[in-house]
UniProtKB/Swiss-Prot annotation:
HAMAP family: Formimidoylglutam (MF_00737). SUPFAM superfamilies: Arginase/deacetylase (SSF52768). GO terms for molecular function: agmatinase activity; formimidoylglutamase activity; manganese ion binding. It comes from the Bacteria. Keywords: Histidine metabolism, Hydrolase, Manganese, Metal-binding. This is Formimidoylglutamase. It is an enzyme of class 3 (hydrolase). The gene is hutG. It catalyses: N-formimidoyl-L-glutamate + H2O = formamide + L-glutamate. It comes from Salmonella arizonae (strain ATCC BAA-731 / CDC346-86 / RSK2980). Mn(2+) 2 binds at D155, H157, D241, D243.
């Protein structure tokens, strides 16, 4: 059974510069921490939620540890300066999966996301392995049943694997099957894909599903493809697997990328998504604090979350 917990106030701490000026504030001073999961109380705000789960990573023979990511990322976010957009963040706590019930955890996240979106919030989820994406994406599809939903994944992997059970490598095949069941088009784009990390079978499945695929080698000239994809859909779900980054920027993941796409280029790609007015949901997944020796990788991941909230329109 997946359980919900409010976040400890000790996570949101940092340097206090308020004596300098009224607007010299950091995120730990502007994030609202809710003691209850009550999205109906926070319309037009951004629901910050953790999905503490790495059961999908374990099933996918990866390096476990991502279940500890949500709180590690909160700590990294806490001391960052608060600018426009960050005052909308409401921390709605963590959903903590109980192994081995991945499917139940995904359903719980799906329901929570749907509730947030139907209450007028938008969702920023801190995973968790990339199994987060099925629960998160399904909640978005449920909330916007009459509109076209585009899924944008920044990832070294297509995550269209076919297995008997759900894993961190299957979320977009699961979402494609959900779209089939709901008789809607599966709009999926994956940027940063490593051909060396995806088999021909996965590539063939992407072609069969009409997936927009941009390889890691081509991401430096991919803004036009991103803009075209944004224009085709009504609502957007953005998911960032941190293994899209090169290993020298992001070693703390289950499967570090030998090549990857640098952070500055990832930010350039997601800026038009965030500013489009269509983004309803975003997540950061696969961060593994066990492999982050000095906290540098957490700061890299946190900068992505910081930037999304700042640019979100």
């Amino acid at each position: 059974m997946t359980q919900w917990y409010p976040v400890s106030p000790t996570l949101w701490q940092g340097r206090d510069d308020s004596a300098e000026a009224a607007d010299a504030r950091r995120l730990f001073q502007t994030v609202i921490r809710s003691e209850d999961f009550a999205p109906q109380d926070w319309p037009k705000q951004i629901a910050l939620m953790g999905f503490a789960c790495d059961e999908g990573v374990k099933r996918n023979a990866g390096r476990p540890g991502a279940a500890g990511a949500p709180d590690a990322l909160r700590k990294a976010l806490a001391n960052m300066a608060s600018h426009n957009g960050h005052e909308r963040l409401v921390d709605l706590g963590n959903w903590v999966a109980q192994a081995p019930d991945l499917e139940g955890a995904q359903q719980t996240l799906r329901d929570a996301v749907r509730r947030c979106l139907c209450a007028g919030m938008r969702t920023l989820v801190l995973g968790g392995g990339h199994e987060t994406a099925f629960g998160h994406g399904a909640g978005v599809l449920d909330a916007f049943a009459q509109e076209s939903v585009g899924i944008i994944n920044l990832d070294a992997h297509l995550d269209l694997r076919q297995t008997e059970r759900a894993t961190s490598g299957t979320p977009f095949r699961q979402l494609a099957q959900l779209c089939d069941a709901q008789r809607r088009v599966f709009h999926y784009a994956c940027f940063g894909v490593s051909r060396a990390a995806n088999t021909r079978a996965l590539w063939r499945e992407a072609t069969r599903r009409n997936v927009t695929v941009v390889e890691d080698l081509d991401c430096y000239n991919a803004l036009a493809q991103m803009t075209q994809f944004i224009a085709r859909v009504d609502k957007i779900y953005l998911t960032i697997d941190l293994d899209v980054l090169p290993v020298w920027e992001m070693p703390a993941v289950s499967a570090p990328a030998a090549l990857g796409v640098p952070l500055i280029q990832i930010l350039r790609l997601i800026e038009p998504v965030c500013r489009s007015g269509k983004l309803q949901a975003a997540d950061l997944v696969e961060f593994n604090p066990r492999f982050d020796k000095d906290g540098a990788a957490a700061r890299v991941a946190a900068r992505l979350g910081w930037q999304i909230a700042h640019w979100w329109r």
